[in-house]
């Protein structure tokens, strides 16, 4: 079943999550119409290869054209219109940046896999629960309702201001008319009546001025209250969701809704400011004793201006945190002299600002003594913001060609001698701009989440561990001295994040049994719901009896899955995290030949399989093959190893002991679609292949002594050519072959 078909069968709460990350960048109509084709392309690789991305974009447009041709025959006018519009938008938006469409589609597919994994989890973790609180959704609806109410109130005061202007014009006309009369006419009854009318009009004007100012004061109060409570809380929640998304959590959303709220409030405040200026003009033309406008207007204008400044300062955000295109799942880790991308957004989208706002990027602008290392940003570090071409286009700017460069220290060498490891040093990228609008000049500044600077890719795993720990442990976006005294993390939160590493990086998260095994590896307690873990135990202290840390072990497994067993992992056929004790408990009552796949606890980046059989006396026996590492898996795909694996035992003919994947799935049914070649057959030495050579293949073979329940060591896997093996079988007895394989030279 395709991934998209699985998505469509999700419950409504998960479908709502899917709906949130499909927009004009990658419309859901395209995902639906081209589901299978999209899933068959390597978008992640294309996100780092411009040539490949260009080809995929062209092929995507060709696929769209084919769909257009099909629906044209069906005369589906609405779908034809939508497809033409989508094609035009895609071609215009990504023509100059094809790698971006690859990033967008890759992120969408990865997020689908994360949601599918979450749907299969029995419970959500504490972090994800906190992000999906019903009270948060209720607050968002309240914010939108209050913003709309403020906008409506400002429209009403606009009418009041216009009415005051009309009333004052009429009063002014009547008053001047009386003033131009002859002295003899001013004593007439009609004039006296007109004077009374003017007095009533003046009283009404005074009342309406006070009423309008009172309404405006109330609007200012409500706006102030909204901005400093619910709206700021919404923004802080979005920033927290962004933090969590950076370390593999649910894709953050809601920025478009915030943009609508910020923009409407800004429009309302500027409109209110113009109304106050209009009232000042009216008061200048006509004032009187007790006129409320001169007494209140200045203070009110100051409050409105302050709110505008405050709104703009909060509206300048980092929409997409710094990330190297070569490592899209490892944001906030930057390598010297390697380009990274970062995107800024102004949540107040006013047409007057299009191409008028220039943003400057710098690094460690406000930092003086936190690190001996100093950096500068090379490349284009000043760019203008523009409104994107989409239905809800944002006013944004993306820096794509920035490179961090380390400066030499004053001592003449590179400064790495601080109190922290390089991967524990936190740095900040700052962005500055200035808004000039309607007579106001507003200086804005915002910063990225803390980043870790590395000079060698080998530092990436530990740097990523620092990013994980920081963003799990704190909401503070600028605590650059965090690792002076890193706080412990709750084990339940940390395990949830570990599952996110697998769902975001290799397409499938961890289930409760797998997480339980990790908890036992991290702590001796059997229940991990309320435990805590220190930074040192997670990333710096070696595991008991091992020469590596927990994080190094886990990162090596992620790398192994990504490069060598990804399809098997995504299909759920790798149990992976299971202890030897639990492994035997699971297998002991199963049919002979039942096996499972688990990650080695003693070898970095190793995977092994264990199968069960019975001795002649009926005794249950377990056999675990020496773990396969990336070196061995580079020579032979793991699925092919499972298919071709042979065991030589006593006088028996070599046979494959692997029959059923736990619990009872026939091996070929589970792995058949992943086999990369035909089964290996042993050729006779006299058989000739192309150009007269004897065909040769690698066969994974283990020897097991008849009196042992464990595979032989040091070499339980011996690749040999079929011709050599055939010669051995013809000229030597099985006992002699076994003796030879026990030789210390056989492992060389």
Swiss-Prot record:
One of its GO terms (cellular component) is RNA polymerase II transcription regulator complex. Acetylation at Lys-667 is required for JAK2-mediated phosphorylation and activation of STAT4. The modification N6-acetyllysine is found at residue 667. PROSITE patterns: SH2 (PS50001). Its main location: cytoplasm. GO terms for biological process: cell surface receptor signaling pathway via JAK-STAT; cytokine-mediated signaling pathway; defense response; interleukin-12-mediated signaling pathway; positive regulation of transcription by RNA polymerase II; regulation of cell population proliferation; regulation of transcription by RNA polymerase II; response to interleukin-6. It is found in: Cytoplasm; Nucleus. It comes from the Eukaryota. The keyword Transcription regulation applies. Keywords: Acetylation, Activator, Cytoplasm, Disease variant, DNA-binding, Nucleus, Phosphoprotein, SH2 domain, Systemic lupus erythematosus, Transcription, Transcription regulation. The modification Phosphotyrosine is found at residue 693. InterPro entries: p53-like_TF_DNA-bd_sf, SH2, SH2_dom_sf, STAT, STAT4_CCD, STAT4_DBD, STAT4_SH2, STAT_linker. The modification Phosphoserine is found at residue 721. The keyword Nucleus applies. It is linked to Systemic lupus erythematosus 11: A chronic, relapsing, inflammatory, and often febrile multisystemic disorder of connective tissue, characterized principally by involvement of the skin, joints, kidneys and serosal membranes. It is of unknown etiology, but is thought to represent a failure of the regulatory mechanisms of the autoimmune system. The disease is marked by a wide range of system dysfunctions, an elevated erythrocyte sedimentation rate, and the formation of LE cells in the blood or bone marrow. Rheumatoid arthritis: An inflammatory disease with autoimmune features and a complex genetic component. It primarily affects the joints and is characterized by inflammatory changes in the synovial membranes and articular structures, widespread fibrinoid degeneration of the collagen fibers in mesenchymal tissues, and by atrophy and rarefaction of bony structures. Belongs to the transcription factor STAT family. Transcriptional regulator mainly expressed in hematopoietic cells that plays a critical role in cellular growth, differentiation and immune response. Plays a key role in the differentiation of T-helper 1 cells and the production of interferon-gamma. Also participates in multiple neutrophil functions including chemotaxis and production of the neutrophil extracellular traps. After IL12 binding to its receptor IL12RB2, STAT4 interacts with the intracellular domain of IL12RB2 and becomes tyrosine phosphorylated. This is Signal transducer and activator of transcription 4. It comes from Homo sapiens.
């Amino acid at each position: 079943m395709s991934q998209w078909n699985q998505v469509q069968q999700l419950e409504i709460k998960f479908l709502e999550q899917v709906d949130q990350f499909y927009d004009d960048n990658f419309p859901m109509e395209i995902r639906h119409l081209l589901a299978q084709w999209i899933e068959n392309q390597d978008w992640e690789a294309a996100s780092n290869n411009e040539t490949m991305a260009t080809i995929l974009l062209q092929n995507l447009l060709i696929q769209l054209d084919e769909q257009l041709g099909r629906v044209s025959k069906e005369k589906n006018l609405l779908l034809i219109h939508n497809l033409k519009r989508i094609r035009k938008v895609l071609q215009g938006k990504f023509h100059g940046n094809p790698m971006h469409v690859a990033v967008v589609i890759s992120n969408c597919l990865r997020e689908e896999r994360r949601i599918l994994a979450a749907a299969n989890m029995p419970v959500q973790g504490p972090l994800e629960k906190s992000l999906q609180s019903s009270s948060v959704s209720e607050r968002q609806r309240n914010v939108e309702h209050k913003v709309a109410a403020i906008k409506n109130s400002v429209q009403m005061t606009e009418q009041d201001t216009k009415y005051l202007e009309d009333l004052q014009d009429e009063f002014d006309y009547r008053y001047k008319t009386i003033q131009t009369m002859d002295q003899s006419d001013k004593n007439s009854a009609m004039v006296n009546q007109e004077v009374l009318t003017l007095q009533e009009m003046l009283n009404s004007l005074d009342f309406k001025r006070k009423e309008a100012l009172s309404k405006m004061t109330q609007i200012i109060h409500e706006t102030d209250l909204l901005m400093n409570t619910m709206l700021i809380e919404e923004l802080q929640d979005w920033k927290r969701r962004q933090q969590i998304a950076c370390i593999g959590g649910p894709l953050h959303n809601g920025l478009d809704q915030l943009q609508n709220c910020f923009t409407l409030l800004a429009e309302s405040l500027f409109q209110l400011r113009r109304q106050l200026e209009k009232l000042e003009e009216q008061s200048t033309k006509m004032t009187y004793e007790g006129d409320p406008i001169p007494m209140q207007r200045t203070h009110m204008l100051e409050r409105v201006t302050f709110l505008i400044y405050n709104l703009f300062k909060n509206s300048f955000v980092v929409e997409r945190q710094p990330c190297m295109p070569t490592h899209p799942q490892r944001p906030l880790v930057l390598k010297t002299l390697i380009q990274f991308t970062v995107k800024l957004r102004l949540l107040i989208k006013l047409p007057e600002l299009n191409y008028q706002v220039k943003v400057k990027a710098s690094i460690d602008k406000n930092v003086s003594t936190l690190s001996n290392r100093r950096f500068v940003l090379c490349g284009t570090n000043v760019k203008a913001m523009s409104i994107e071409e989409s239905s809800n286009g944002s006013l944004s700017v993306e820096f794509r060609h920035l490179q961090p460069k380390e400066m030499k220290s004053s001592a003449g060498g590179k400064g790495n001698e601080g109190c922290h490891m390089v991967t524990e040093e936190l740095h900040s990228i700052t962005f500055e701009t200035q808004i000039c609008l309607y007579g106001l000049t507003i200086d804005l500044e915002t910063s990225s989440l803390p980043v870790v600077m590395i000079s060698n890719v080998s530092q990436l795993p530990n740097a990523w561990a620092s990013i994980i720990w920081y963003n799990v442990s704190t909401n503070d976006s600028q605590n650059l001295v965090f690792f002076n005294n890193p706080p412990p993390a709750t084990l339940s939160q940390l395990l949830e994040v570990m599952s996110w590493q697998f769902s975001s990086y290799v397409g499938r998260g961890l289930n409760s049994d797998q997480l339980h095994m990790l908890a036992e590896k991290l702590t001796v307690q059997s229940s991990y719901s309320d435990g805590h873990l220190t930074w040192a135990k997670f990333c710096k202290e070696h595991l008991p009896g091992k020469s590596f840390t927990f994080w190094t072990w886990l990162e090596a497994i992620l790398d192994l899955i990504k490069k060598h067993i990804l399809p098997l992992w995504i299909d759920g056929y790798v149990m992976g995290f299971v202890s030897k004790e639990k492994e035997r408990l699971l297998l002991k009552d199963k049919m002979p030949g039942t096996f499972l796949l688990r990650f080695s606890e003693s070898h970095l980046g190793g995977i092994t399989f264990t199968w069960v059989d019975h001795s002649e006396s009926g005794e249950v026996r377990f056999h675990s093959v020496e773990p396969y590492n990336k070196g061995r898996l580079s020579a032979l795909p793991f699925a092919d190893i499972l298919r071709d694996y042979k065991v030589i035992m006593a006088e028996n003919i070599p046979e494959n002991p692997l029959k059923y994947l736990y619990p009872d799935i026939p091996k070929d049914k589970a792995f058949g679609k992943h086999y990369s070649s035909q089964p290996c057959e042993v050729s006779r030495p006299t058989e000739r292949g192309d150009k007269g050579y004897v065909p040769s293949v690698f066969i994974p073979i283990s020897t097991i002594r008849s009196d042992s329940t464990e595979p032989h060591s040091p070499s339980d896997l011996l690749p040999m050519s079929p011709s050599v093996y055939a010669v051995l079988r013809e000229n030597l007895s099985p006992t002699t072959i076994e003796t030879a394989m026990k030789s210390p030279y056989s492992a060389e």
